[in-house]
């Protein structure tokens, strides 16, 4: 709550100096950017602004659908205000040499900068915990569906959905260490992360389409959903493809390893059960 309040306040403070940034809400500018020569490829550069949307409901078992939906309205508002504030800050410093200063930290008053960095570090730790908890939930579901090898699951409290899988925790630890050793700098991780996010979004859309089909939703609604989201997500995917050789291949390699493990485990159990019967 403190982190997102800070984002909103910083953004609003800068936005008050240049309200013209709000014209970015006009969809025409998005269309103009995409159709103009070279503008389309900028989608790959700005895509990390959507970070978090691909895992919005990964903590469904921990937080509940209603809590996530209500909090998302607040989170999105503060994020938009902060991005507008960064835009206003960049316009105010147009033509200047920034010397490595990022708009996010540039918006902060000098006296507040240490507090802002500390709060950003704490927010990163909290966000990492959300990813770890979401991984436990997904692996637990995969085990129940016989898509993942059996693993020891601990329930540290009586609260619904609270669980801990030691083997997954160690896998995440090893993965983080290896990724950091390979990329060395956070800026070099953008390629792998961006490609991961869009592939996750495409998979979520595919699964939701499958769900709508088996639940016999109205066909025009299904097609409307598929066309709308495919246009948006495929556009971002195409714009991200140039990042494949700059680290994006690592995301695909990890995805292939996990998918292969799930495939082998599932069909091996089917073969074994067939002989047992």
Say what each PLM segment does.
Residues 1-277:
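The structured alpha-helical core of multi-pass membrane proteins
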């Amino acid at each position: 709550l403190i982190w997102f309040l800070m984002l909103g306040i910083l953004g609003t403070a800068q936005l008050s100096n240049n309200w013209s940034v709000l014209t970015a809400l006009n969809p025409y500018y998005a269309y103009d950017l995409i159709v103009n020569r070279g503008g389309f490829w900028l989608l790959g550069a700005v895509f990390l602004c959507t970070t978090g949307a691909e895992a919005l409901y990964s903590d469904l078992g921990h937080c509940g659908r209603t809590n996530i939906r209500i909090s998302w309205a607040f989170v999105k508002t503060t994020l938009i205000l902060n991005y507008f504030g960064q835009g206003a800050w960049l316009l105010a410093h147009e033509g200047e040499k920034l010397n490595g200063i990022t708009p996010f930290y540039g918006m902060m008053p000098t006296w507040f900068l240490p507090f802002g960095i500390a709060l950003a570090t704490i927010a990163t730790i909290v966000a990492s915990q959300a990813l770890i908890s979401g991984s436990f939930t997904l692996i637990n579901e995969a085990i129940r569906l016989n898509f993942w090898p059996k693993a020891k699951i601990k329930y540290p409290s009586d609260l619904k959905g609270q669980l801990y899988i030691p083997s997954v925790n160690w896998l995440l630890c090893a993965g983080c260490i290896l990724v950091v050793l390979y990329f060395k700098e956070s800026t070099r991780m953008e390629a792998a992360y961006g490609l991961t996010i869009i592939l996750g979004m495409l998979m979520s859309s595919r699964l939701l389409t499958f769900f709508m089909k088996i639940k016999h939703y109205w066909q025009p609604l299904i097609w409307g959903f598929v066309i709308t989201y495919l246009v948006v997500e495929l556009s971002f995917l195409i714009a991200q493809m140039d990042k494949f050789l700059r680290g994006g291949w690592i995301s695909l390699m990890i995805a292939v390893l996990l998918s292969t493990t799930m495939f082998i485990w599932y069909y091996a159990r089917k073969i074994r059960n067939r002989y047992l019967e």
